[in-house]
Amino acid sequence: MAKPMDHVKRPMNAFMVWSRAQRRKMALDNPKMHNSEISKRLGGEWKLLSDSEKRPFIDEAKRLRAVHMKEHPDYKYRPRRKPKNLIKKDRYHFNVTYNLGEGDPLKSARLSGDALSDSLSAEKTSVAAAATRMFFSHHLSANPYPFLDLNSKISELPPAPFPHYSVLGYPSGLPAFPGMGVLAGAPHAHPSAGSPGHMLPYNCLGWPGSGPAVPSSYVLLPGMTKAQHEPYLAYAATI
């Protein structure tokens, strides 16, 4: 078996000749400085030198190259390379199995987590729906539209502190929601003094003069007259 040939160093260039003494000096001045930082600083200082300052080191590098050629006439630059078995070494410390036939384990884990969160949210929704049904069970069984029976609910409230306004803040003759006067009866109407083009129900006569007047019910469009509403008003008076 042939003995491996000894490694022959390359001849120094001008920068290496100059930095040999400078590196030693900088390492003594900064003992904790890393070698890479020293090389970086030496490279910056070398670039700042003028050609006249670099000339002696260039000449010394030429002389060393000539000596190197005499000593090693068959020299070829062969950079050191790492063995191929180290390069091809497995880069992953933990082997992760990936089987396309059975499905991705990471994907299945993610899907199971999503299913768990969906089941929790569905359970919360069902609990809230059950609580709502329990709360409104007796109201829904007695009346399919419990929220439309507003007159009976308002009559159960305590009397208002002011005679002209109800507890909910509306005038005594005005229902809690617009349009509910039709459900509660009193379809009779009269023209509004503030706005001639509107009709107001008769049950709003108890409003104070300074109270808010909300025109509603009928609007006279351009080209229409009040007489066109008379048949309806006459029919409403008979109800």
Swiss-Prot record:
Expressed in all cells until gastrulation, becoming restricted to the developing central nervous system later, where expression is in the forebrain, midbrain and hindbrain but maximally at the midbrain-hindbrain boundary. GO terms for cellular component: nucleus. The keyword DNA-binding applies. InterPro entries: HMG_box_dom, HMG_box_dom_sf, SOX_fam, SRY-related_HMG-box_TF-like. One of its GO terms (biological process) is response to steroid hormone. Its main location: nucleus. Pfam families: HMG_box, SOXp. It comes from the Eukaryota. Disruption phenotype: Ventralized embryos. May function as a switch in neuronal development. Acts as a negative regulator of transcription. Plays a role in dorsoventral patterning of the embryo. This is Transcription factor Sox-21-A. It comes from Danio rerio (Zebrafish). The gene is sox21a.
